[in-house]
């Protein structure tokens, strides 16, 4: 029996240790080793990391009783979507002065960073927030606000780092406000307004009520009872059903400093005396009440402070003491009702009252729950000085520009920052439209057309691709499809202005002419292939044509790749983004071949093959081209002209088409055509197009003889 007792005690001990270990493991699961490491690096002396507290899961970092700082995850505070459509999660560490000590990326789904730009660059960017206060303004790039902190973007991931900036600063500010470390932005004081002192005509009571100079708060006994429901004072002194609508208090208040208000209510003599008693920066308020409840009470008699009325502005409470109170014996406004209580209260200069900003008069109602205990509830009367009584300081041009810039949403700030690139791109697209609409005239001048096209391809590669990073991707298509089913947000697609404009133009051109306009003119990687192949031809590199029967069947590969990527995206968009590396765009265009060797080898291999057979990748492997080809069947226009002889018997255009988009029977395959317009130059060339050459020869034979050119011996 003794042994049994020992065994039971041992099991209790083991069970207690198991509970302790489970608790520690649970805490460790909540706070990862990486988060602990970052905290230890910032605060090496930290002894305790508290549990998540409050709405934002903030952990208190302490050494003994001293608070060293606070740590939290941004995903608990804000979920702003990044370029991938999903939020980025960071751990942010604040010190007690609301200074950011660390911001570290814990999780992201950005495709350019998953496979592309090294993550170290993103961590290096987030490290720049060390030393920034939570109430400072941080701008990625340049800013017209001289007070703003500016940080450089990460090349190739501008949108991502702008979202990171928004996430870090918004989350840090929100948490710092919740912890009481800084003021709420909504409570930040503007430059105070001044009351106009010009003489003004007096107004009646109804006129002052009408323009908002006097504000009114009416409360019934039933409203008071309802306010105490759920508290310890519920049911104490409640009115029965017959008396719920009886008035509890009818309260009025106004700022007396404006002459039109003060003279109307107090009369000229009393108003002058009141203004003479006020020091600069002091403001007087009239409070008038009727009903069973006294807004003055009797507390000020015992303690010298009025405990039933107070003002609140910018989150600050303005309380009134007996020295701030003046008796008011009479009010002179025409049509004014009678009041049981009247008083004037003065806000002192040290309380920094601003007559130009909204404020509230709070009425506090107390119910006794014990000999000395009681419960308070408050009722607010919103007040605002009419604009005609105020003079506001004019902001400087720099302040206006800073305010305008700060008020812009994130996507609009990106557009402003890239306004030059947007302007150049829009100009280039207008030029492309002009080429398309004037194609019949331009193709009659082959040399001009070829130079124009070569120049446009060089612009697409160098400026649009390598400089502006305007390379569309099948990832954009997958993201768009998922957004349609998971909550479409325009901000996500507007966050990159160049891609948004390109996609808008591409979508319109698909409906009008098919995929060829984008693939042949606006794809930087396609332009790179075409320019390299042109150079290879000039260097007499041999060219190989795939037999058309084989070529036609190889078209299916890109559609299969597209279906595989779409299927993967249904399981995991991040997995599909990684599989989309079948596109060499990131390597060759976005990152300029600055990647791991295997990515570079893949892109270079495609370009080497392209030297011998033009645009092999575009023809057979490009999932983006496949996605654009699907809606091409619905195109509205077919401006590529053909003749009856095309394909039967003439095969010139089919042989010359460098991507083999013309069937042997002469039909142009719209799903494969890149709209290079070479066939149209041949179509209009009377010295090259066989049907035109034959017609010219026939006309020459049937033309009447010219006697002046017949030799004399033949006459």
From Swiss-Prot:
Localisation: Cell membrane
Residue range(s) of DNA binding per entry: 210-229
Any one GO BP annotation for this protein: positive regulation of DNA-templated transcription
The keyword Magnesium is assigned to this record: no
Keyword Transcription: yes
Database matches in InterPro entries: 4Fe4S_Fe-S-bd (IPR017896), FMN-bd (IPR007329), NosR (IPR011399), NosR_regulator (IPR052378)
NCBIfam families named in the record: TransRegNosR (NF046105)
Protein purpose: Transcriptional activator of the nitrous-oxide reductase gene NosZ.
Topology in the lipid bilayer: Peripheral membrane protein
Keyword terms of this UniProt record: Activator, Cell membrane, DNA-binding, Membrane, Transcription, Transcription regulation
GO cellular component, one term: plasma membrane
GO molecular function: DNA binding; FMN binding
Organism: Pseudomonas aeruginosa (strain ATCC 15692 / DSM 22644 / CIP 104116 / JCM 14847 / LMG 12228 / 1C / PRS 101 / PAO1)
Protein name: Regulatory protein NosR
């Amino acid at each position: 029996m003794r042994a049994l007792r020992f065994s039971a005690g041992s099991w209790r001990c083991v069970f207690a240790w198991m509970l302790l270990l489970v608790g520690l493991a649970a805490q460790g699961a909540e706070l990862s080793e990486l988060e602990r490491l970052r905290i230890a690096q910032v605060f090496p002396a930290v002894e305790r990391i508290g549990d998540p507290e409050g709405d934002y899961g903030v952990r208190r970092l302490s050494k003994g009783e001293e608070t060293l700082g606070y740590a939290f995850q941004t995903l608990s505070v804000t979920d702003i979507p990044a370029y991938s459509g999903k939020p980025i999660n960071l751990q942010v560490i604040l010190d007690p002065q609301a200074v950011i000590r660390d911001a570290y990326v814990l999780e992201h789904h950005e495709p350019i960073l998953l496979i592309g730009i090294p993550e170290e660059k993103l961590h290096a960017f987030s490290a720049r927030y060390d030393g920034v206060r939570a109430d400072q303004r941080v701008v990625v790039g340049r800013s017209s606000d001289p007070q703003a902190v500016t940080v450089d973007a990460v090349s190739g991931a501008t949108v991502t780092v702008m979202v990171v900036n928004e996430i870090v600063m918004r989350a840090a500010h929100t948490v710092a406000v919740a912890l009481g470390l800084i003021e709420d932005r909504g409570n930040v004081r503007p430059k105070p307004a001044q009351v106009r002192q010009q003489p003004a005509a007096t107004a009646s009571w109804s006129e002052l009520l009408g323009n908002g100079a006097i504000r009114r708060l009416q409360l019934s006994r039933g409203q008071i009872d309802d306010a105490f429901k759920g508290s310890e004072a519920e049911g104490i002194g409640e009115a029965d059903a017959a008396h719920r609508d009886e008035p509890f208090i009818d309260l009025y208040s106004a700022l007396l400093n404006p002459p039109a208000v003060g003279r109307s209510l107090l009369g000229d003599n009393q108003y002058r005396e009141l203004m003479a008693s006020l020091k600069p920066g002091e403001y007087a308020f009239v409070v008038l009440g009727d009903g069973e409840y006294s807004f003055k009470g009797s507390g000020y008699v015992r303690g010298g402070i009025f405990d039933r009325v107070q003002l609140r502005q910018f989150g600050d409470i303005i309380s009134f003491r007996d020295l701030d109170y003046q008796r008011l014996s009479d009010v002179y406004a025409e049509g004014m009702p009678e009041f049981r209580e009247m008083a004037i209260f003065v806000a002192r200069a040290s309380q920094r009252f601003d007559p130009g900003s909204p404020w509230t008069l709070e009425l506090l109602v107390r119910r006794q729950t014990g000999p000395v205990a009681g419960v308070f509830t408050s009722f607010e009367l919103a007040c605002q000085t009419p604009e005609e009584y105020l003079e506001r300081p004019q902001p400087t041009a720099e302040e206006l520009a800073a305010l305008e810039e700060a008020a812009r949403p994130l996507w609009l700030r990106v557009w402003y920052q890239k306004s030059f690139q947007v302007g150049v791109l829009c100009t280039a697209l207008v030029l492309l439209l002009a080429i398309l609409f004037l194609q019949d005239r331009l193709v009659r001048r082959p040399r001009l057309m070829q130079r124009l096209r070569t120049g446009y391809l060089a612009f697409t590669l160098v400026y649009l691709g390598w400089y502006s990073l305007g390379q569309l991707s099948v990832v954009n298509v997958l993201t768009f499809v998922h957004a349609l089913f998971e909550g479409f947000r325009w901000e996500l697609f507007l966050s990159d202005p160049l891609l948004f404009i390109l996609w808008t133009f591409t979508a319109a051109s698909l409906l009008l002419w098919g995929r060829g306009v984008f693939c042949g003119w606006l794809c930087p990687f396609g332009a790179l292939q075409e320019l390299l192949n042109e150079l290879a031809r000039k260097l007499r590199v041999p060219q190989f044509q795939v037999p058309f029967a084989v070529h036609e069947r190889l078209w299916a590969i890109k559609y299969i790749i597209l279906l595989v990527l779409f299927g993967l995206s249904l399981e995991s968009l991040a997995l599909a983004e990684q599989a989309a590396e079948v596109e060499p765009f990131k390597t060759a265009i976005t990152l300029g071949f600055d990647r791991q060797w295997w990515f570079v080898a893949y892109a270079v291999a495609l370009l080497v093959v392209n030297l011998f057979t033009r645009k092999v990748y575009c023809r057979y492997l490009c999932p983006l081209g496949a996605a654009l080809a699907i809606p091409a069947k619905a195109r509205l226009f077919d401006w590529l002209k053909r003749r009856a002889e095309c394909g039967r018997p003439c095969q010139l255009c089919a042989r010359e088409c460098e991507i083999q988009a013309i069937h042997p029977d002469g039909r142009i395959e719209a799903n494969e055509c890149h709209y290079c317009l070479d066939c149209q130059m041949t179509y209009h060339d009377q010295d090259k197009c066989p049907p035109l050459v034959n017609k010219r020869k026939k006309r020459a034979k049937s033309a009447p003889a010219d006697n002046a050119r017949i030799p004399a011996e033949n006459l």
